[in-house]
């Protein structure tokens, strides 16, 4: 008897719409691969009942809080249900950009200079020391919530008088916010599938940076896979990504986003342990370049579930 698979999609995070699209694609791909899969939306179904509903395994196609941050993973482990992607700790760390950066920095890996602020500090008014630290980053900077995905709540700040508004927006989404030095070079993403690192992708957004619209709505964002790097650069990038992935304790599948600055140095941005799987998504694109169909990709991700 084949396993009955729950594809978790939708949910209640800010990335619900993206997740519904990802989940629909994953569901179709699994069924094409002969898998007995069914959609389950945690917004409508009590996921503590998955086992009593007869499911033996879970494919997590949720993005953001409640699906990608370790909470769901912990519950599935308590229930004894195997699931796709990283475990509790790696999921929680990857969702938290600040703590990812601290870990990577501690491991000697390159990250962009940043200043972290809490909502309480912002509401009280920033100290002279904090203002000096922010000023030392130079302009432009990028302001982002620490625990939000899909570039939700993120802004590029090019003038000092725009910083307060950018912080206000970011604090609508999280208690902690990062102000990061703007890196001017191209952005790359590298997907990981089991032990395999897939070909890197270079991202060229039509706007200022790779924001929510560029990720999911724009037809003008350009993707290059292969990324056009020299063989030695591609090897350096893959080695950096593998180190970043293992430092966080990630497993199964996911991707890591990286910037190449004008100084020729790669800088780690963030890890995604449950990336998008829509028509615009990057992991399927990298898999295609490696000779793998979408259906083969999702079946392989499911095989890696434990």
Swiss-Prot record:
InterPro entries linked to this entry: ATP-grasp (IPR011761), ATP_grasp_subdomain_1 (IPR013815), D-Ala_lig_Van_CS (IPR000291), D_ala_D_ala (IPR005905), Dala_Dala_lig_C (IPR011095), Dala_Dala_lig_N (IPR011127), PreATP-grasp_dom_sf (IPR016185)
Keywords for the protein's UniProt record, in alphabetical order: ATP-binding, Cell shape, Cell wall biogenesis/degradation, Cytoplasm, Ligase, Magnesium, Manganese, Metal-binding, Nucleotide-binding, Peptidoglycan synthesis
Binding-site list for Mg(2+) 2: 270, 272
Compartments, record wording: Cytoplasm
Oligomeric and partner information: Monomer.
Function: Cell wall formation.
Name used for this protein in its record: D-alanine--D-alanine ligase B
Originating organism: Escherichia coli (strain K12)
């Amino acid at each position: 008897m084949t396993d009955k698979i729950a594809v978790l999609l939708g949910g209640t995070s800010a990335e619900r719409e993206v997740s519904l699209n990802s989940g629909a694609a994953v569901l179709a791909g699994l069924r094409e691969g002969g898998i007995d899969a069914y959609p389950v939306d945690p917004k409508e179904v009590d996921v503590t009942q998955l086992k009593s509903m007869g499911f033996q395994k879970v494919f997590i196609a949720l993005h953001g809080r409640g699906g990608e941050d370790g909470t769901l993973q912990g519950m599935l482990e308590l229930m004894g249900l195997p699931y796709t992607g990283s475990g509790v700790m790696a999921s929680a760390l990857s969702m938290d950009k600040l703590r990812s950066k601290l870990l990577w920095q501690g491991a000697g890996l390159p990250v962009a200079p940043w200043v972290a602020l809490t909502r309480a500090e912002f509401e009280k008014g920033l100290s002279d020391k904090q203002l000096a630290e922010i000023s030392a980053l130079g302009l432009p900077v990028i302001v982002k919530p620490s625990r939000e995905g899909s570039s939700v709540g993120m802004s590029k700040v090019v003038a000092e008088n725009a910083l307060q508004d950018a912080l206000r927006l970011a604090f609508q989404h999280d208690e902690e916010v990062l102000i990061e030095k703007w890196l001017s070079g191209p952005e790359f993403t590298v997907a990981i599938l089991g032990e395999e690192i897939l070909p890197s992708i270079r991202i060229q957004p039509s706007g200022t940076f790779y924001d929510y619209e560029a990720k999911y709505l724009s037809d003008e964002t350009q993707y290059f896979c292969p990324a056009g790097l020299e063989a030695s650069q591609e090897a350096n990038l893959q080695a950096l990504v593998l180190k970043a992935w293992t430092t966080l304790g990630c497993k199964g599948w996911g991707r890591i986003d990286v910037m190449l600055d004008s100084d020729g140095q790669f800088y780690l941005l963030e890890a995604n342990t449950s990336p998008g799987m829509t028509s615009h998504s990057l992991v399927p694109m990298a898999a295609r370049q490696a000779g793998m169909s979408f259906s083969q990709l999702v079946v392989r991700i499911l095989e890696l579930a434990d």
